[in-house]
Amino acid sequence: MAPARSTLSDSPECWPTLHLADWKDTYATLHMWTQIVGKIRLELTPRLNHWWNVPLYVSPHGLTTSLIPYGNRQFDMEFNFFADQLLIRTSDPKSAALALKPRSVADFYKEVMAALRSLDIEVRIWNMPVEVADPIPFDRDTVHASYDADAVRRLWRILLSVDGVFKVFRSRFVGKSSPVHFFWGSFDLAVTRFSGRRAPQRNDPDPVLRKIMQEAYSHEVISAGWWPRNAEIQEAAFYCYAVPAASGFAEQKVHPAEAFYHSNLGEYLLMYDDVRRAKFPTTVLMEFLQSTYEAGATTGKWDREALEAA
């Protein structure tokens, strides 16, 4: 079996171990920190279809907001996991840096807001975390206060590798596709393909959730991603799901052999450790992405000839 692409690396250092038990407290803290930064981007950027103005993006040293407009200036915010800093850079000479170290979410939140004000950037965000159980307002969260720099660098190394594979996978589709982006609510890296057809209207009982989900899933999609944990699976895994999922989607044969369908989640999963241990992790991951996409596209009767690169 040959590597998927020569520009992608199968080196073990690019696919390090990352078990949740080893960094659970840091994960919970970093999740809140990324939500603070992500909400700043959300507040100051124009809304895009499918909430594409929400995510962060993998950068050479961590996660970045990309450019955020602010009056006659622009700025960005980057978690630099290589230097253990949150960097805030403006289009004028001003900048600020906050240390990434063991500290409470409340302290981090206050320092981020103070740093923005020092750069003449005023912004207010809803300070309640999302997509977590028992949320604590950012300014009152003294519970989450851990930072294991080594674990975070391993996370960053994985994100770099996965981002590269996802971008190659994305290049093989000529239909509408999302960027490869990091959603701070669910704390996962994802890429989404679209059939071009509208999806059925959502019927979620909660009206707020229904509005959010209707925008996210206004059109038929097949989405793949990676998360370091999930409420159902407390370990890192790759996933793929279809919305709407056509009849027979869950019964399709996918690759590699270790991949499986999780009925509670309604997703195909491939545990990260199965990829990491493979001789060619990039090839194994690409097999999962391609075969699960084909499972959704075939059962969903997508126009594959028109949508896929020749």
Model-derived features: where do they sit?
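Glycine-rich, often proline-containing surface loops adjacent to acidic residues and nearby aromatics
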Residues: 14, 84-97, 130-150, 236-238, ...
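Phosphate-end processing signature that detects enzymes handling 5′-triphosphorylated RNA
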Residues: 2-27, 111, 117-122, 231-232
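N-terminal ordered "arm"
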Residues: 9-74
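Aromatic/basic-lined ligand-recognition segments
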Residues: 140-227
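TerminUS-proximal long segments
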Residues: 2-3, 8, 260-310
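Short conserved micro-motifs at the rims of enzyme active sites and ligand-binding pockets
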Residues: 67-69, 249-255, 280-284
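Long, hydrophobic/aromatic-enriched structural stretches that serve as scaffold segments
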Residues: 57-135
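Low-complexity, glycine/alanine/valine/leucine- and proline-rich hydrophobic stretches
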Residues: 214, 219-271
